[in-house]
């Protein structure tokens, strides 16, 4: 039997239905919002994975081409590997769901959100969050939700709930919030340098809408039978073993976590753990080693948090609001277009900028339609950055997600195409990592663009904030280490300029965060961001005025649309000839925008002149160096511009009387001519004698007729 709930959100009907499709899944939801339809399913294995002590959760978001009435491209004509948007949306759904599974739940669980119909409004991501949560809520899978997702835009100073794509184009905010009825669990935002107070107000508005949706999901859960959740049996560890381990390692852990160097600290902790396992070996207990590890890591978790909460001290000796030492270098690679090495503590990013032409734009065919990207940021996290040896693979979800966050942070300061007609690619290679590598990418990317003479509006910096919360004891941390990210309760990344926020990303591991704590974290992040910006500007205060000698020079001009065909020539002959002759790249858009690119300035000027000659229109009174194309009895036809001929009448060839045209000019000669007239039919009358010095001597008469 099917059960349905409905709710009006921002003037469109949100409909959640269960019991009609995918009934063999543990939970399934058919969610519709406008004409967008998302099917979300949740399935968990019946038995926990043996030896697993983590949540084996997989979340997949997929867009069916048929949802937008399309057939996939490529040879096989079917959906292939996930697109970047699908990867990012999978992460967007995963992040708020993951903390809401109970401790000790180690059953393999898969959540799939499939877009079956798209009205091209761009709402499928937040519907995916809501539908996935609802699928878990109506299932028997243990889940501490439900949650819901809402998008907020801001146009003309007013907030807009779940804006469509057209509205977002003019919006200074693109914010996605997911949360329970009680608290916010996840934030993902891009903004045009908005104040912290505005960001907080938008998050609070989103949470108010989330509460309404969560209430409807709970209503649907009751309607559909309120399935009892599976019991989660946590592994029992002998209390006397816990006492033994604590006695052996507690002081050693306290000493080890105060070692500032990450590698040395981890080496010491690993040694203590190994010694403890060796001391407490029991051949009759096959789980002994695993239990010792669980107890040990639990003690490490407790000691790190207690040290911060009780002493206000961190593993590297900093206070809660302190930033690690920063060094910035620019121009570190001689042949690249722009480069920077940004180091903060034990985290280091090598950021490199490459400038390209319109040929280098990324063309994307999405459900919402085709579009191009002229700015790209790619983040790489090689294994050596954390002292590991493992095979190199194509970028994973984490790398795609970190790159997208840094790209979103920098995008608001990128100049428009009119100001800077380049395709811009930034690559961030993480050379070492101990937390906040995505934020190092933002800082390094800013410096690399400035080194490449990209006229950015303002420098951007990023900082990762953390939270340690035990009941009423709370500590917010600035510029968190990997250890604090792993053992803390929040990862809150804030990027922006001195004027305001350009990107936010927040993930909570506990039951949520209150607006008060969020406000405190944003204000502390602002102070840290301004400090980082001041360090960056000591290395390079403003974008360079001169580009690298190895970067392409680009000239942009606009021609009349009826001239495009002339520039291209029959079968592309003309444009290919110019490119071959001058060693340049030329791109012509349907709008008449012509882009000429070359590393060599002289070649650029030559190509520019050749294009100008093609598109130039003849002007009355102007003198041209033309080529005689044909001789007739009554005059000569002269090509003054490519493809444009005019007639020099025999009477206009010279000041003296001309008996035969061939006496003065021959085909192929180049002569100066002046335009006398362009008649209604477009015929051009030229004169050669008007460009020649007047004859001297009394009584000399010009030939005036012919």
What is each PLM-predicted segment?
Residues 552-554, 561-706:
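Single-stranded RNA-binding regions, centering on S1/OB-family and related RNA-binding modules
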Residues 25-110, 115-122, 181, 188, ...:
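Glycine-rich, flexible beta-strand/loop modules in the N-terminal catalytic cores of phosphate-handling
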Residues 140-260, 449-545:
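Mobile "lid/hinge" segments at catalytic clefts and subdomain interfaces of large enzymes
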Residues 1-233:
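Long, basic N-terminal domains or extensions that often function
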């Amino acid at each position: 039997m099917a059960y349905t709930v409905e709710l009006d959100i921002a003037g469109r009907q949100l409909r959640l239905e269960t019991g009609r499709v995918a009934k063999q899944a543990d939970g399934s939801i058919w969610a519709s919002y406008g004409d967008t339809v998302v099917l979300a399913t949740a399935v968990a294995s019946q038995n926990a994975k043996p030896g697993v002590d983590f949540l084996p959760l997989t979340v997949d978001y997929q867009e069916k081409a048929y949802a937008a009435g399309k057939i996939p491209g490529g040879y096989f004509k079917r959906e292939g590997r996930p697109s970047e948007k699908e990867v990012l949306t999978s992460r967007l759904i995963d992040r708020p769901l993951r903390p809401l599974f109970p401790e000790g739940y180690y059953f393999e669980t898969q959540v799939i959100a499939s877009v079956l119909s798209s009205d091209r409004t761009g709402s499928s991501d937040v519907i995916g969050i809501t539908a996935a949560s609802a699928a878990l809520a109506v299932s028997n899978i243990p889940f501490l939700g439900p949650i819901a997702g809402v998008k907020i835009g801001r146009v003309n100073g007013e907030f807009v709930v779940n804006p469509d794509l057209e509205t977002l184009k003019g919006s200074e905010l693109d914010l996605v919030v997911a949360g329970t009825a009680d608290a916010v669990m996840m934030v993902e935002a891009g903004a045009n340098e908005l104040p912290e107070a505005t960001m907080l107000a938008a998050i609070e508005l989103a949470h108010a809408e989330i509460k309404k949706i969560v209430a409807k999901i709970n209503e649907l859960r009751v309607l559909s039978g309120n399935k009892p959740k599976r019991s989660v049996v946590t592994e029992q560890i002998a209390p006397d073993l816990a006492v033994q381990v604590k006695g052996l390692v507690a002081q050693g852990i306290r000493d080890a976590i105060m070692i500032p160097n990450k590698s040395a600290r981890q080496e010491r902790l690993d040694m203590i753990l190994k010694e403890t396992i060796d001391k407490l070996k029991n051949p009759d207990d096959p789980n002994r080693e695993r239990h010792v590890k669980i107890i040990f890591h639990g003690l490490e978790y407790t000691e790190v948090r207690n040290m911060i909460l009780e002493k206000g001290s961190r593993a590297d000796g900093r206070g809660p609001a302190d930033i690690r030492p920063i060094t910035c270098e620019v121009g570190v690679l001689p042949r690249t277009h722009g480069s920077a090495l940004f180091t903060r503590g034990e985290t280091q990013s090598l950021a490199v900028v490459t400038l390209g032409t319109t040929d280098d734009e990324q063309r994307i065919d999405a459900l919402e339609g085709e579009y191009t990207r002229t700015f790209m940021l790619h983040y790489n996290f090689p294994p050596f950055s954390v002292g590991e040896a493992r095979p190199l693979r194509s970028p994973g979800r984490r790398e795609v997600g970190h790159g997208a966050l840094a790209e979103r942070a920098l995008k608001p300061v990128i100049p428009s195409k009119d100001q800077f007609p380049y395709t811009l690619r930034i690559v961030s290679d993480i050379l070492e990592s101990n937390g906040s590598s995505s934020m190092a990418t933002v800082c390094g990317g800013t410096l690399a663009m400035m080194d490449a003479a990209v006229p950015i509006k303002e420098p951007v910096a990023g900082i990762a904030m953390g939270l340690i919360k035990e009941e009423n004891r709370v500590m917010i941390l600035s510029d968190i280490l990997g250890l604090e990210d792993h053992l803390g309760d929040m990862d809150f990344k804030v990027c922006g300029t001195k004027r305001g926020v350009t990107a936010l990303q927040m993930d909570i591991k506990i039951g949520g965060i209150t607006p008060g704590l969020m406000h405190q974290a944003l204000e502390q992040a602002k102070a840290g961001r301004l400090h980082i910006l001041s360090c960056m500007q000591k290395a390079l205060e403003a974008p360079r005025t001169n580009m690298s000698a190895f970067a392409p020079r680009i000239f942009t001009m606009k021609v009349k649309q009826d001239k495009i065909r002339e520039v291209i020539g029959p079968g592309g002959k003309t444009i290919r000839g110019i490119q071959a002759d001058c060693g340049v790249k030329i791109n012509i858009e349907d709008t008449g925008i012509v882009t000429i690119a070359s590393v060599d300035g002289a070649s650029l000027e030559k190509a520019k002149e050749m294009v100008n000659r093609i598109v130039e229109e003849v002007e009355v009174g102007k003198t041209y160096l033309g080529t005689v194309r044909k001789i007739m009895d009554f005059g000569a036809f002269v090509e003054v511009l490519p493809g444009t001929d005019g007639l020099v009448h025999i009477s206009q060839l010279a000041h003296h009387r001309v008996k035969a045209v061939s006496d003065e000019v021959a085909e192929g000669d180049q002569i100066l001519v002046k335009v006398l007239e362009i008649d209604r039919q477009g015929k051009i009358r030229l004169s050669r004698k008007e460009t020649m010095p007047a004859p001297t001597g009394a009584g000399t008469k010009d030939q005036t007729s012919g």
